[in-house]
Amino acid sequence: MLVSTIGYQISQNSDFDELKKLLLNHTKRAYLVGGSVRDAILGIGSKDYDIEIYDITPDKFDALMQECGAVGVGKSYFVYKLKNYDLSLPRTESKSGYGHKGFSVEYCNDERIASARRDFTINSIMVNIFSGEVLDFWGGVSDLMAKRLRVTNPKTFSDDSLRVLRGVQFAARFDLVCNSDSLKIMQKIDISDLSANRIYLELEKFFIAKFKRRAMELLSELGLDLKLFGVEFDERFIQQISNKIHTHKASFLYHLINYYAIDGKSLISRLALPNCYSISYKQPFLRRVSKFELLKIALDMPLYQWLGLDSKARIKMAKDLGIYDCKFSPHIDTASIKTTGKAYGDELKRLKIEAIKDYLNDCN
């Protein structure tokens, strides 16, 4: 679809009618910006919009926002939240201290200059919500169409090291390859200043993304596979991950931990990941499966919850056995077990194994 058509569709989107009425007497230069435009071009639906508003002073903007009941999310950054809009004034940012808060922010009423602060060109495209005019000062549209990840401003990109990990998750989500000049810039950036939480928030997007190969290749080129996960990704592992069906955000770590025989508990702790990721080292791992082994796992969980159910063949086997959506729950006469303690547990386990064998014999 032509980008001009996207611009027209955005200008006609009824989601912006209320906002246009609010801004009409103040400006005709209000732009949909950032990921909202990128996603629109890619045909990805969104109900949350980032709007950048020009031709209004910070004082008048603050007054207007308070009048309409918008909630400020950082006055020094001129950003307000109104329903599903993030409304902001155009700005420039310059590094003035350490960490992600060490920035000086200045109001800027020039679209080209303001858009230069965007991390990658694919996020620098702007669409006027009144006219549908598309502003693409940095070639973001052509980069998006070519599936190319390219830094917008080489001079300021390194001001925030988080941009490196943002690049990784963009590669994973949108099937992008980093161009050579941008790669060289990113390779020089140390991410040691980032908190564990900021790193996790970007990694999580990678964990659930479709094109993991792109991100893994980029992580490897940046040396971040070793820094973050303690191993260097080899082509066999990258290919293996590419071929797997991933249904849970812990799937990548599950395969990483078992492929490289990593201490999963230590890795999860070092990355400060939430407890939900502990299943990546707690769940059983099988290189080859049989009906018997699947039924054993299904004693504890329906198999759709098992991270090892990662291929069409395994999914089909689970469904054929009737254990995809529900656990395998054979009738066990526990009253017949006359022992206690560990002996009781051992006998119960033996009876369950016998029940699995009986079930398979009946199936045959």
Segments from the language model and where they lie:
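Catalytic cores of the polymerase beta-like nucleotidyltransferase superfamily
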Residues: 1-364
